[in-house]
Structures are given as structure tokens and as C-alpha cells.
């Protein structure tokens, strides 16, 4: 698998490419399948349809890897928090975890209640071409904890930050419990057939440097070490969004560092490129214009070169109204321009 070879810094005929949120609303096929499912959450919990939407971008775009179609919030949901997705508002939990007593709401063994995810993985791996990799994933403990504490997405993270500074022991207790569930979840994804795993720290930038490493990075690092100790052949990818200023302190037992669009690729290469394969980092909005897209591709490839050590990706997820023709062209463009 070209993608796996690249994650292990082995020679590849070109720079492999896949895209975050490559299964999404910009594809009419996805929208049709989602309509058949009934709701976003129903789609996540239906192995047959989750398999279908996972495979769609591989067939349409010819990317080098599929990423499991699911949502990071299925873990806290299976820990006991009732989850709903609301039109125009996004996900929301009906309960929040803000006190020691609230911790009692959380049930252990969430990884054992996610059978629909593992069944989807079995189906995807059976249907996916053997040269195409399948990526499993989870959210970071910090990112999941913010949803569990706030009850929904937030711009200020007021409750989470209040807990961090006024009751750090409680926050650590939440993070530890989430981390244990995530370790089991990734292990079961690997046993079900994924070829690599990725941890998304979507809200990393909410924290200042002095607390980021204690309350987020250390937990991600621990999860990565857990996976590498048990499955050394499985590449582990970490994606902490928006921490360009912290790159000097990044270390741990993982393989691939995801670079978001706001982090200069040359900076990431200078700070991390000798230790980790870098993944990224095209600004997704460039896909609105073919010329701007090509300009971005040329810039990234000029920095990363044609040697191993790079997986091409967007620096954030695909936007719902991006022209699919440009996504198809992006894959061809990267393959052609990075050919060894």
C-alpha cells in the first residue's frame, strides 16, 4: 500500500494523497446515501451505509486511502451521554459532565458497544482494493472532553477552561476515562481491519502552551504509545489543529504529524520533518479555484520535495460546496507533479 509505505518513510512512486472529510456533502452520492439512512447518526450506526459512503470518494476521486466514515462523538455517546445532531446547529449532548457527581454518568467499556463501527470496518476492508489503505480514527481526549463539558461545540470553551484552571483534578479524571475508552476503541478498530489510525485534536488551539501539553498532548501521546506497543506495524497519525507555535516541544512515539492549513509547511518540516512523516496541508478553500489550487500544490511540493516523508492532504476538512471536479483534479495533479 503506497499510503502505508509513505507513513513508514519507504520509497513510493509518487506522494500519496487522501483528504480529510473526503466522504461528505460535496458528493451527491453521499447526500443520496445519507437521505436513505435517515439522519447523520443513523448513517454512522448503519454498517452497510457507512461502508458505502467510505468507499464513494475512493471510487470517485481515486485517493490512496479510505477513512472510516463515523464521528468522533460516538465514543462519549457510548459512554452514556445522549447525542443528537441538529440541522444548522451541529451535535449536542443532552447531559454534561461538569461535577464529580456527573462523572457517575460515564460508563466503562464504551469500546465494547461500538460493534456497528467494527462491522463497517469489516465490510469496507472486504470491498476496498488491496492497494488502498483504510484509516481508523478517534478524537483526542481533550477535544472529546470539551464536547462532554460544554454539551456542544463552543467558541469560548468557557466551562472547559473554568474546570481546567479551577478544578484540574476533575478534568484529568474525565480525560483519563476518555483515554481508556479510546485505547480500547482504536485497538478494536485495528483488530477489525484498519491499516492506520489517526487522532484528531480539533480544539488544540483553544489551549495556551503552558497547559496544552499537560491536558491534551500527554494524553494523545499516551494513546499513541499504547497503539505502537501493541501494533508496531500500524502507523499512528496525530493531528493537533492550530499549534504552530508549539512545534518545538512536540515529541512522542507516533509516525505521522498532521499539519493544518494555518501552519507553514516549511516551519513544520524544519521542526519535525527529520522525525515524523508530515501530512498536509493544502488550504481547502483553494479547491474553489483551479489555478489557486495548483498554486498551493506547487508550493507544498516545492517544500516537501519528491523524497519520502510526506502524505498530501488538506489542512482541514473538505467544505460542503467545493466542486467535486476540482477534488478529482487535485488527486491527478498531486500524482503527476510528485511522480518520482
Swiss-Prot record:
Disulphide-bonded residues: none
Catalysed reactions, as listed in the record: uroporphyrinogen III + 4 H(+) = coproporphyrinogen III + 4 CO2
InterPro entries documented for this protein: UROD/MetE-like_sf, Uroporphyrinogen_deCO2ase_HemE, Uroporphyrinogen_deCOase
CDD domains hit by this protein: URO-D
GO biological process: protoporphyrinogen IX biosynthetic process from glutamate
Any one Gene Ontology cellular component term annotated for this protein: cytosol
Keywords: Cytoplasm, Decarboxylase, Lyase, Porphyrin biosynthesis
Chief site of localization: cytoplasm
Residues noted as binding substrate in the record, renumbered to the chain: 21-25, 40, 71, 147, 202, 316
Location in the cell: Cytoplasm
Family membership noted in the UniProt record: Belongs to the uroporphyrinogen decarboxylase family.
Entry-linked PANTHER family: METHYLTETRAHYDROFOLATE:HOMOCYSTEINE METHYLTRANSFERASE RELATED, UROPORPHYRINOGEN DECARBOXYLASE
Subunit text: Homodimer.
Protein known as: Uroporphyrinogen decarboxylase
Amino acid at each position: 500500500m503506497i499510503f502505508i509505505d509513505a507513513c513508514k518513510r519507504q520509497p513510493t512512486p509518487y506522494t500519496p494523497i487522501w483528504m480529510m472529510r473526503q466522504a461528505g456533502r460535496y458528493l451527491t452520492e453521499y447526500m443520496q446515501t445519507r437521505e436513505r439512512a435517515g439522519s447523520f447518526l443513523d448513517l454512522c450506526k448503519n454498517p452497510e451505509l457507512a461502508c458505502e459512503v467510505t468507499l464513494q470518494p475512493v471510487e470517485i476521486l481515486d485517493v490512496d486511502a479510505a477513512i472510516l466514515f463515523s464521528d468522533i462523538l460516538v465514543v462519549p455517546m457510548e459512554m452514556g451521554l445522549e447525542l443528537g445532531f441538529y440541522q444548522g446547529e451541529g451535535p449536542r449532548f443532552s447531559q454534561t459532565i461538569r461535577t464529580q457527581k456527573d462523572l457517575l454518568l460515564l460508563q466503562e467499556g464504551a469500546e465494547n458497544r461500538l460493534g456497528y463501527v467494527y462491522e463497517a470496518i469489516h465490510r469496507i476492508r472486504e470491498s476496498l482494493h488491496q492497494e488502498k489503505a483504510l484509516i481508523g480514527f478517534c478524537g483526542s481526549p481533550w477535544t472529546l472532553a470539551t464536547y462532554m463539558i460544554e454539551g456542544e461545540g463552543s467558541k469560548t470553551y468557557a466551562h472547559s477552561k473554568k474546570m481546567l484552571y479551577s478544578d484540574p483534578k476533575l478534568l484529568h479524571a474525565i480525560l483519563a476515562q476518555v483515554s481508556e475508552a479510546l485505547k480500547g476503541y482504536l485497538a478494536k478498530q485495528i483488530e477489525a481491519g484498519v491499516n492506520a489510525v489517526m487522532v484528531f485534536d480539533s480544539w488544540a488551539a483553544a489551549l495556551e502552551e503552558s497547559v496544552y501539553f499537560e491536558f491534551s498532548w500527554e494524553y494523545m501521546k499516551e494513546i499513541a504509545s499504547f497503539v505502537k506497543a501493541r501494533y508496531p506495524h500500524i502507523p499512528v497519525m496525530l493531528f493537533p489543529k492550530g499549534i504552530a507555535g508549539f512545534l518545538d516541544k512536540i515529541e512522542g512515539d507516533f509516525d505521522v504529524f498532521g499539519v493544518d492549513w494555518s501552519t507553514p509547511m516549511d516551519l513544520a518540516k524544519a521542526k519535525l520533518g527529520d522525525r515524523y512523516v508530515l501530512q498536509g496541508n493544502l488550504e481547502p478553500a483553494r479547491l474553489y479555484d483551479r489555478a489557486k489550487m495548483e498554486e498551493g500544490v506547487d508550493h507544498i511540493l516545492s517544500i516537501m520535495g519528491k523524497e519520502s516523508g510526506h502524505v498530501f492532504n488538506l489542512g482541514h476538512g473538505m467544505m460542503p460546496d467545493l466542486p467535486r471536479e476540482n477534488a478529482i483534479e487535485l488527486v491527478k495533479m498531486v500524482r503527476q507533479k510528485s511522480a518520482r
